[in-house]
Design a protein with these regions (language model features):
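Short, low-complexity disordered leader/linker segments with a strong preference
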Residues: 1-40, 65-66, 70, 95-96, ...
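Extracytoplasmic "Venus flytrap"
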Residues: 40-67, 72-88, 99, 105-109, ...
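Short, solvent-exposed amphipathic alpha-helices that sit
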Residues: 52-67, 159-163, 194-215, 260, ...
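Short beta-strand elements in bilobed, periplasmic/extracellular small-molecule ligand-binding domains
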Residues: 65-82, 183, 206-232
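Hydrophobic alpha-helical segments within soluble ligand-binding/sensing domains
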Residues: 87, 149-182, 232-235, 258, ...
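Hydrophobic alpha-helical
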Residues: 92, 104-121, 125, 202, ...
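Flexible loop/hinge segments that line or gate small-molecule binding clefts
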Residues: 114-158, 283-295
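Hinge/cleft segment of the Venus flytrap/periplasmic-binding protein
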Residues: 180-189, 194-195, 206, 305-354
Length: 354
């Protein structure tokens, strides 16, 4: 009996010893790098709840899943300065957790120290959407501490080019059948680079298409109204100026223009019924106008393809982590939407209300 007890005691001791070794082995694995270490990418956006950012998140998640990574996705409550400390905390938390990569769009300046940490820790950073503020990037470059490996954003020129292609398809027959003086109007929302690129991208692509077609070549002119912003009903004034110039088609370079123009035509009876319009971005008024069956026609608009922005940003981050070829600049063209696909685009978060 005593011999049996001694044998059982030895067996128990050995079992405990093996269990302890396994336990410590497991702890060592967790400490040195569990199976998820090296597989997490932090995405810190300029927001989280808005439909645009939810679409970015879906794209980011799909890219991460494809390559065997997980992501964390966080964003401040708003893009105002009061929420900048909150976003800074999100970035610092990600760096403290030693994520494999960081995908970032900041709402303000002040990220130099944190991005320097990323550089020192060999954490690649991909900026997306509006990216990281220029002053921060300039300081990082000056200090040779820039961790940014790629930029992913909508190309305003390419997106406006998509709008020009679709708009030209719709009004081509009108130009061809006209008296040779078909006026295409452009309302440029401001004089920033964004405004310049959108208006310029539209005009250049439209001219390319119209001049290459024998039925429209030489039968149109482009009239452009450039405004310093949306104050004092500037875009309504631009609409009236183009109307006086005989515009039969008008491209509007952002949602703010669309809103003011939509309000103006709603208050003007049938005055603008003979004009066709083309928009940019999205929003409730643009959706309402797109669905309208009476009054001036909104042919369509081009929206930022937020899903592709999220997908490509994470994909480039994975490439950097795995020492594969990284595209330093990824330009997203934008997605066309009109009355035929508006519901589908809303469902997929490519077109947002609000």
């Amino acid at each position: 009996m005593k011999k049996t007890k001694r044998i059982l005691a030895v067996v128990l001791a050995l079992t405990l010893a093996v269990g302890t070794m396994i336990a410590f082995s497991g702890c060592s694995k967790d400490g040195d790098g569990d199976s998820t270490k090296g597989k997490t990418i932090a995405v810190v956006a300029k927001g989280e709840s808005h439909a645009f950012w939810q679409s970015v998140k879906k794209g980011a998640e799909d890219a991460a899943a494809k390559y065997g990574y997980t992501i964390t996705f966080r964003g401040p409550a708003s893009e105002s300065a009061k929420d900048l400390p909150s976003q800074m905390e999100m970035v610092q938390t990600a760096l403290s957790n030693n994520v494999s990569g960081l995908v970032l769009a900041t709402i303000g300046e002040g990220f130099v120290d944190m991005l320097t940490q990323a550089k020192d820790k060999n954490i690649p950073v991909v900026q997306f959407d509006s990216g990281i503020w220029a002053n921060d990037v300039e300081t990082l470059n000056k200090n040779s501490k820039n961790p940014i490996v790629a930029s992913v954003a909508t190309s305003n020129r390419m997106a406006a080019g998509v709008a020009a292609e679709k708009f030209f398809e719709d009004i081509k027959a009108d130009i061809a059948a006209g008296d040779g003086n078909y006026v295409v109007g452009v309302i440029q929302h401001d004089e920033t680079q964004t405004g310049i690129d959108r208006a310029g991208g539209f005009v250049d692509k439209f001219k390319e298409l119209a001049d290459a077609d024998e039925t429209t070549k030489g039968k149109y002119t482009i009239a452009q109204e450039v405004k310093p912003g949306d104050a004092d009903n500037a875009y309504k004034a631009a609409l009236e100026a183009l109307f006086e110039k005989g515009a039969k088609a008008i491209f509007m370079s952002n949602e703010g223009v669309v809103k003011q123009v939509y309000d103006a035509i709603g208050a003007a009876g049938s005055k603008y019924d003979g004009i066709k319009f083309c928009g940019f971005d999205a929003g409730s008024k643009q959706i309402e106008w797109m669905r309208a069956t009476t009054g001036p026609k909104l042919v369509g608009a081009v929206a930022q393809d937020s899903y592709q922005i999220g997908y490509n940003a994470v994909e480039q981050c994975v490439n950097a982590i795995e020492s594969k070829t990284v595209e330093a600049e990824v330009a997203i063209a934008g997605a066309w939407w009109d009355a035929t696909n508006v519901d589908e685009m809303i469902k997929s978060n490519l077109v947002y209300e609000g």
